[in-house]
C-alpha cells in the first residue's frame, strides 16, 4: 500500500505549480489501474475480432465441391405392381453447391454417370443401362439443377429441374437433414445433406414394365457431402 501513502510535493523542487501537478498525476498511476486499462483494451480488441470473423463467415456465397466418395443418388422402384422394391444407387456423381447463409440462398448443380448404376445384380444393372430403361449409351448423363430454399436459418428444399433420358422435368427435393462442420481429417468445412424426391419415370420416356403392372413412381434419395473451396 506504499503507493497510497500521503506525499508532500514541493513546488520549488518541481519548478512550478504545473510541474508539481504532473508529478502528482504520475504518482497516481497505480499498477492496478494500468491492469484494468489493459484488460479493457483486450476485451474491445477481442470483440472486434469476433465480429469481423462472424461477418466474414456469412458474407457472400461460399462454393462447395461435391465429394464423389460420399455422394450417392439412390432410388427405389416398383417391381410387378408391389411384388417387391428394386433399390439401387449411382456410384459416380460430381457437382457444385453454392450457399449464402446470410442471404438465405443457394444453388445446386449435379451430374451423374448413368452407366455407374449399381443394384447388386449385374444382370439388373445391364438391363437398367440398356434402351429399356436409361439407354446409357445414348444418354450417358443425368443432370439436376436447382435453387435451395430456406425456412428461417434452415435449408428445407431444392426446387429445380431433372434431366434423364434426354427429357427435362421439374423436381422438388425435400431436405430431411443438413449439417456443416469442420472436417477432422480434411481440415476444411464440409456440409452434408439427406434429401428425398419422387417422380414418374414415364414422364421421362422410361415406361418399361407398365404393361406388366409396374408402378412408374420412382423415389429418389440423395445422400451427399460437399467440401468448401
Role assignments for model-derived ranges:
Residues 7-9, 13-14, 25, 30:
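Low-complexity, intrinsically disordered or signal/transmembrane-proximal segments
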Residues 16-18, 27, 54:
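Serine residues within intrinsically disordered or low-complexity segments
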Residues 45-56:
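Bacterial N-terminal signal peptides
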Residues 59-229:
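Low-complexity, acidic/polar, glycine-enriched regions of mature
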Residues 4, 9, 55-58:
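Aromatic (phenylalanine/tyrosine) cluster motif
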Residues 34-46:
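Bacterial N-terminal signal peptides that target proteins for export
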